């Protein structure tokens, strides 16, 4: 209770730096680069490490592994009882298409078939996402703190845990597609970690059956769920998600946002708005899930993979655990 933490800096791993520094070239040959033996070996080791992390809340007594050096890090500084502390927490590196590297590309003969997913579960793979509750962290000098499922720089006891799902569809799935990252996936993941949201806000542009919306909710979600069957807007009025966030969240809250509305111009405008100098919303977000729509056609004027790397890096540099 006597500690005060602030985000300090984002430091990409050498693996991420390798991709980012070569992205002008790599963005047109992602699959062939990922298939190189040096990339395959790192990919498998990092993927298996994330899968093991995902299964439980991170234990500060867990054994460090050399593969952890391939992860990027969010760095924090804290003051506890007038003493300064430095902390770092792992996050998945931005590599390949900024998603599970063993999806979206042809199968690599040297990779065991049991490491591949199929169909929608490959397209919507969540195996490469390292959320904060599962993420390894270190505090220097060591500090005996009671970690109540979330690191102290992300959440203060007594504050809120908020999920905002922009493009939510129904709670369980959109068109019965249970492979998607939807509200239920977040609910299940956090419930497994004994973390309960205090508030869930769901935006959906498509007109949904009101009765079904509420019937699909688990009993413990009903009282904390706000459903807004109106599309989000970039104008800073009542349907702007950043304005809503500013109204309901405080810096000590743990805020998770998913943005997936399948309207690239609006998504891009909202992201640009979030990065605006005068927009305080970016300092309220802890984890943000977003898949930027891009083109691999050299002649296209659409955004390229390089634009995704730049966007994700900027947001991570503001302290947001940005996931693709």
Feature annotation, model-predicted:
Residues 162, 254-256, 287:
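Structural motif
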Residues 219-222, 247, 276-278, 309:
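Short, low-complexity, polar/charged sequence segments that are solvent-exposed and flexible
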Residues 200-204, 257-259, 288-291:
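Extended hydrophobic secondary-structure segments that form protein cores and membrane-embedded regions
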Residues 263-324:
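Conserved acidic-Pro-Pro-aromatic motif
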Residues 157-159, 196, 250-253, 284:
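Residue-level preference for short coil/turn positions at secondary-structure junctions
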